[in-house]
Amino acid sequence: EVIAPASLDMDIRLVSVIDDSVGADALLTRGGETSLQELKGKRIGVGMDTVSHIFLMLLAQEEGCSLDDYELVDFSSPSNGATALVTGEIDALATFEPFITSCMNADDSISIVADTSAYPTMINDSIVFSGNILDTRFDDVVKVMECFYQAVDYWKENPDEANEMLGKYLDCSGEEFAETMTKLNMLSAEEAYAQMTAEGDDSWTASMSAMSSFLLERGRISQDIAPSDYVDTSVLAAITEN
């Protein structure tokens, strides 16, 4: 969702990775299948060109499958996709929390085929600003990100109170929100900066480069794009130096 607009030459800057998905994204099924191979010919719900779609494509690559072997049903609304799985309109669903938990709570026959706990650096959430805003209001962007990391620190230090407050925004209880957050590794500013500036074949930058090539090969973007074209670590550098 960052690489695609960047590949269209949109002036966006990814200023921080904020978490790694360690189970917050998954492929669910109604039929007890334990692999994507076993779902061949079935109807799979997914938001096309979303993170869930990318997860499904990567999973297909891991298992040596082609998504042409499945009937993909596009759901722009994740809640509609969850409803379709629970009611049996589709056989499987690529989705994310809190919809994973809500589906499994609604029907105990629904189970996880695969999730990102097995691929901890595959899916990240990040914060992106327009290049113009970053260039003209850098200090304000730093303040926004400082506030964000203060909120993360508050959540870590006051989990019970924070989970209750945040759960209200997702129409779930504090306990349900807490369960959802066990599937995300929330990064501090220092951890995010270290992850985004690390080098090597197993680094975050290498993963982003590989993701761009993967999307290009599958026709999801029209040109390959390097992380250096859209990643800007200057905000995190300013925060971590203070």
Language-model segments: residues:
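Helix N-cap/coil-helix junction residues
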Residues: 10, 33, 65-67, 172, ...
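Secondary-structure end/capping motifs
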Residues: 135-220
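Pocket-lining segment of extracytoplasmic ligand-binding domains
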Residues: 73, 79-170
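Short phosphate-engaging motifs
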Residues: 1, 23, 35, 52, ...
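Conserved C-terminal helix/tail region of periplasmic/extracytoplasmic solute-binding proteins
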Residues: 208-242
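Phosphate-coordinating loops and pocket residues in cytosolic domains that bind phosphorylated ligands
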Residues: 41, 105, 232
